[in-house]
């Protein structure tokens, strides 16, 4: 994980990357655990990833459903531009397989082009897109990175509620 926590149900991803990291021990692959087939059930991915004592069935489900989507690369030594890091990711094709996916980037030079690409991603079922400046790698949050999402705002009238029970006591909802 980003904080160094080891996940116990992702042996298939670890196995897919072990050779790469033996040859490149200082490299950081930045990405997220995802599967676009589960875009409407992200909780399923989270549930499989967070299993502390996975069963054989849990491991099999994770192997078929959880993928690591790689979108950035840092070699631990050089501070390269994003464009150079993307080239490194595309050169290392040996790591990509059913469990490891490369997230391609496109150079955007206008707001209209960014909107067009964003519309493509929405049509494919993604919730948005990411805009990244051609800057140096930065661990954690970065001002070089911005989410591009569409939001809708609406008002509603509350017609009823339930009081919370157990750990939700004193709040609304189950």
Indicate where each model-derived feature is located:
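Covalent nucleotidyltransferase
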Residues: 1-98
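Nucleic-acid 5′ end/cap handling module spanning
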Residues: 1-3, 58-60, 64-65, 73-76, ...
């Amino acid at each position: 994980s980003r904080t160094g926590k080891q996940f116990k149900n992702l042996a298939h991803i670890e196995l897919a990357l072990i050779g790469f990291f033996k040859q490149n021990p200082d490299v950081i692959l930045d990405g997220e655990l995802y599967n676009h087939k589960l875009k409407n059930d992200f909780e399923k991915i989270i549930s499989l990833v967070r299993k502390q004592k996975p069963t054989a069935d849990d491991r099999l489900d994770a192997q078929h459903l959880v993928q690591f989507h790689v979108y950035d690369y840092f070699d631990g030594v050089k501070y390269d531009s994003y464009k150079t890091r993307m080239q490194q990711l595309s050169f290392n094709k040996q790591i990509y397989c059913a469990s490891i996916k490369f997230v391609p980037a496109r150079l955007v030079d206008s707001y209209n082009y960014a909107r067009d690409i964003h519309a493509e991603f929405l049509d494919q079922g993604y919730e948005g897109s990411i805009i990244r400046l051609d800057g140096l790698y930065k661990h954690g949050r970065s001002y070089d990175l911005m989410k591009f999402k569409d939001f809708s705002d609406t008002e509603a009238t509350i017609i009823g509620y339930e009081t919370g029970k157990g750990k939700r006591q004193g709040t609304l909802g189950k």
